């Protein structure tokens, strides 16, 4: 069996980071909105449950959450987590959904109550007011903090290596121990280029929404 070359190994690790990044975004963005709505609920048990969830997740390290998701099912319920990638996805989605919910909160609360009252005067339901009047304003307001959180996510994907997931930094480290330094620099280039693309993308989105004054 031929040994894997550094470039093949880094490419494999790169794919892990990218998959973890996009799956986390795909699931955490809508879940964060659900958590935000639950926190605004008039049903107090649901309201306090969601707020307690956010408090716990934001108050504990992502690294700890990765270990809990990987080992807790087996230790508590004799149902071991067989896939380390799945464990990483669950931990990342839970963590980032909590942070996204707080970003949504800031955006929603920044919209004046007069906007809601104007919608009510026009005979709109609360759902119609949110999607037709509030949503675009919220999106414009949350783009800067959301972009920061998304860029942080790209770097946080490297934490998956602590549960044995062979992401790009773990792959680079293996070859560094063999006396090669360039895989580390290649890894740095990956993060710089990827985050550079995201920065350009979010900048483009902000410019596209400049017409919408809030």
List where the protein language model places each region:
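Transmembrane alpha-helices and adjacent helix-loop boundaries
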Residues: 1-214
